[in-house]
Amino acid sequence: MDTNVSNSWEQRDMQAVFHGFTDLGTLNAEGPVILTHGDGIRVFDVHGKSYIDANSGLWNNVAGFNHQGIIDALCAQARKFPGYHAFFGRVADTTVALSEKLIELSPFDAGKVYYTNSGSEANDTVVKMLWMLHRRNGQPQRRKIITRVNAYHGVTVATASMTGKAYNAEFGLPLPGFLHADCPHYWRFGLEGETELEFSARLARNLEELILKEGPDTIAGMFAEPVQGAGGVIVPAEGYFEAIRPILRKYNIPFIADEVICGFGRTGEMWGSVKYDMQPDIIVASKCITAGYFPMGAVILGKAFCDALMKVSEEAEEFPHGFTAGGNPLGSAVALKSLAVIEDEGLLGNVNKVSGRFMARLKKLGEHKYCLLYTSPSPRDRTRSRMPSSA
């Protein structure tokens, strides 16, 4: 990296840009990577070097970089009607069309769609929806939010409190009332001799004990990712969601699927909640909704919840919440085209086609004598503890 070259892109970055979620010691020693463009699965830096972006722009770019159809849709909308809000009963026609499409694609009987600019904002919005609904229904004490250890739901004050990661202690979070149930990572947390189904049943019992300890009438809702992405791509143990669903319904606790990462094909289904049989009341979406070409988040409300929220909002004369760019027509046009690309170009089928081959080749790589690092589950008598950060 040209961190010592005067006026290099790297030096300019280090003087002007504050990077989040970045080891600043390593950044100062090695410098940043400054990117200029992308094409397909590759991104290119200022020196012309290309990289396979295996993380897909933080799970965003489901259609790859430089997809001409999506770019054309964005440009056409920019020429027609580049930006507007969804306040005061006004909205762009493209946003109405997108809402209809999301309702069509939803895995449940959907009511309406609410728009934000990110997954964090969408999850935060649902918290306020829950609080308003319970308060208006005479249950103002129902404010506690249940998530899980190693969960990731965002970076706002509320969603960082929901995120089950230790680093949020730097901000004095979580706030009171944000509870973290067990992480459904069977390999790491399963007991000796315990099957996956037994593990899932134990976690369900623990969840019910948590609810009873806190008081069922104090719980506003539970959020869960189909696969815990930032927590380590943790696939839920067999039978996990089937085990916890009846408990949530028993105590009338709304269940929210955070599909910010898993939604729109990442798991080989349009929704991760379908693949793992979550059956949520609300879906939160972002990222692949626009294939990474425009910031957007969406809350898809199940009809029963939506009807209840609309009723109390009418009583209050409004739902007093919103974002200036939420439901932006540019984002809506991009999302409509991105969803068409996912369907028309067979992205779901391709995920299912290549995933088995990818895993087979990954295992084969582990057998190669020059493989630098290959990991697989160690014997059950190992500690299964995390490697130290200094490793």
Residue ranges and their predicted role:
Residues 386-391:
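Hydrophobic alpha-helical segments, chiefly the membrane-spanning helices
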